[in-house]
């Protein structure tokens, strides 16, 4: 959740004593950020609430968690939904100025679900790898898979909460003229190197580690499906490729900007005012792009699954929105359990 401010481009004074740093005027960037984030956050909140809400409803109403993936999909939808709701609250800051406690909560909850989403995506890819590539090991774990899934989800939430501690502690409500800000402001005793390291951790755990795990696991799954000469490997492989490419396309630009910010802090170099404006602008735009994943996750990880589409139809049928689902209708999923390797991915 990128924010901009009217501030000296250096966090601390430099040069001779008594000489004030040059101020970098960023009102134009602030105006763009306010308009851009208001429109984008509103759109993402509406779309993401519908998609993730349907995933949660179908899981609660029809699905018993039988694997780590089932449990993590449920928690991924919950995490994405909570993250999007914090974006909608961020839009209200201009109308309802936040207090200190609400600002800390807003920053902390956003970061908690930011990391939580990536951790659940990572766990899903590892579980799919185990289910397809390590089938005997996965089968031995099957009787306790649900309990194991909740344990994995609990550990993921705990790790995400630890990573969000700086936001819960240092979130501050500020006001500049008519602009209300909710920002993370580290005390001056915290060195620039420590703040740079904090940004570096965000890049490593928010992009590098999930990407490497996803790419490795899905590459192994793809090799196994091709070697097994599955009846319909192409569609499954296209879905696996889409999972990785969408993740990279949405997360890489913002991760590069955060990495640039970390390098600036760690190397203690000074940006010109023009460069600082461009950096803030890029952080705002790429941040909105990164948050788009919360709307696409339900499509990529649930809506493409045949079982989920059947459960979604049952949900709408129970609400009287559509007719009942005939088990043998053309194009309808068979209620019989599938046994192919690709069925472990639920994307047939």
Language-model features, listed with the residues they occupy:
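Intrinsically disordered regulatory tails of 7TM GPCRs
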Residues: 1-28, 140, 269-273, 306-348
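Cytoplasm-facing ends of alpha-helical transmembrane segments in multi-pass membrane proteins
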Residues: 49-60, 77, 84-88, 112-136, ...
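Helix-to-loop junction signature of class
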Residues: 41-45, 58, 82-95, 107, ...
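Intracellular effector-coupling site of seven-transmembrane GPCRs
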Residues: 152-153, 182-193, 199-207, 219-256, ...
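Loop architecture of class A 7-transmembrane GPCRs
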Residues: 17-27, 96-111, 134, 144-152, ...
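Extracellular TM2-ECL1-early TM3 structural module of rhodopsin-like
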Residues: 30-38, 42, 68-126, 130-142
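Juxtamembrane transmembrane-helix termini
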Residues: 58-65, 93, 124-140, 169-177, ...
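Hydrophobic alpha-helical transmembrane segments of polytopic
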Residues: 37-40, 44, 149-156, 243
């Amino acid at each position: 959740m990128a924010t901009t401010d009217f501030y000296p481009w250096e966090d601390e004074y430099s040069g001779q004593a008594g000489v004030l740093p040059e101020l970098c005027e960023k009102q134009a960037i602030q105006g763009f950020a306010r308009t851009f984030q208001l429109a984008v956050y509103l759109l993402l909140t509406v779309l993401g609430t519908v998609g993730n809400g349907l995933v949660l409803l179908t899981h609660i109403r029809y699905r018993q968690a039988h694997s780590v993936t089932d449990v993590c999909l449920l928690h991924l939808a919950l995490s994405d939904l909570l993250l999007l709701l914090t974006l909608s609250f961020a839009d209200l800051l201009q109308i309802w100025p936040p207090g200190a406690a609400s600002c800390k909560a807003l920053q902390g909850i956003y970061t908690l679900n930011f990391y939580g989403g990536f951790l659940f995506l990572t766990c899903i890819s590892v579980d799919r790898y185990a289910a397809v590539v390590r089938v005997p090991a996965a089968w031995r774990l099957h009787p306790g898979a649900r309990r194991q899934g909740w344990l994995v989800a609990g550990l993921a939430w705990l790790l995400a909460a630890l990573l969000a501690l700086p936001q819960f502690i240092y979130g501050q409500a500020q006001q500049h003229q008519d602009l209300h800000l909710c920002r993370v402001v580290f005390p001056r005793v915290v060195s620039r190197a420590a703040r740079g390291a904090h940004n570096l951790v965000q890049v490593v755990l928010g992009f590098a580690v999930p990407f490497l795990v996803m790419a490795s696991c899905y590459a192994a799954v793809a090799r196994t499906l091709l070697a097994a000469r599955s009846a319909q490997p192409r569609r499954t492989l296209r879905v696996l490729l889409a999972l990785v490419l969408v993740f990279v396309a949405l997360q890489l630009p913002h991760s590069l900007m955060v990495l640039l910010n970390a390098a600036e802090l760690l190397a203690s170099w000074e940006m010109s005012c023009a460069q600082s404006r461009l950096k803030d602008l890029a952080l705002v735009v790429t941040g909105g792009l990164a948050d788009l994943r919360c709307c696409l996750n339900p499509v990529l990880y649930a809506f493409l699954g045949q079982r989920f589409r059947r459960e979604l139809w049952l949900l709408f049928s129970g609400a009287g929105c559509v007719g009942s689902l005939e088990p043998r209708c053309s194009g309808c999923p068979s209620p019989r359990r599938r046994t192919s390797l690709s069925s472990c991915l639920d994307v047939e």
